[in-house]
Amino acid sequence: MIIWIASYPKSGNTWMRALLSTYLYLENDKFDFKLLSKIPNFTRDKYFENIADLNLLKSEPLKISEYWNAAQSRINLQGEEKIFKTHSACVSLKDKWFTTETHTSGYIHIVRDPRSVVCSLAAHSNTTIEKSVKDLLNDNFIGSNGKYNLAELTCSWKINYLSWKKKKKFPGILIKYEDLFDNTEKEFKKTLVFLQDKLNFELNDKKINQAIKLCNFSELSNQEDKRGFVEQVNGKFFRKGKKDSWKEELSTNLKNQIEKSLKKEMQELGYLN
């Protein structure tokens, strides 16, 4: 069965993957980005090989919805719990759901202040913040579809957030990036408690502290500078690691646009009073 780490892009998904892969799979005392391959992106080409025509899925990205079920069924043939990353909203397209309780045993849903998301996403994609805001509010936004990944039906930040929040057919937890930033140990332990029965491991404070130390932002940023990072696109992936970076980068007009469009959800999450 699949356990998802689900989020809108640039919300802390990779940081959580780093923490979890270090805790679960580290064999020495040094973090390596290769560990992240233990928690892969679901839309990697290899999970759809021999199921679909990959060239067709590259040219007609929304057709991937026809193969979500088959790809997840094949993954689950291994008969073990497996963690996957996704930026897909948990929605249906032409009556094809991204995932169901047949394939999924749970999810870790990570959210981040959308004002910070657009700043980080613009730098990561080497585009303007205006373009990132447009994408953030686009209900039909399609992400990824790169060299090694197929398309992800990311949708707007609002749809992405609500789609996982409202999914009641399998258990999940919500982790706010800002809480993970402020109290990494507490939020990481919350995540491990959620996972421990599914993955059959014991909590180990020494390993928790080691994972937090090896995966703090400065360490990950230094690793990226020294060795590079395969998920780096245009700009630096681990850029600032701040909680409220939007206060330094976002114009008043764009700030107001986001807050007006997402007022209810941002208030619900404590991003607006």
Regions inferred by a protein language model and the residue ranges of each:
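PAPS-dependent sulfotransferase catalytic domain
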Residues: 1-175, 232, 240-244, 248-273
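PAPS/PAP-binding and catalytic site of the sulfotransferase fold
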Residues: 12-26, 174-201, 211
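Short, surface-exposed acidic
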Residues: 29-30, 196-210, 220, 273
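Residue-level signal for alpha-helical context at structural boundaries
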Residues: 34, 135, 202, 209, ...
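Compositionally biased, low-structure terminal segments
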Residues: 85, 189, 195, 202, ...
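Short, solvent-exposed polar/charged micro-motifs at secondary-structure junctions
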Residues: 93-95, 184-187, 219
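Short acidic/His-enriched helical or mixed secondary-structure segments at domain edges of catalytic enzymes
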Residues: 210-234
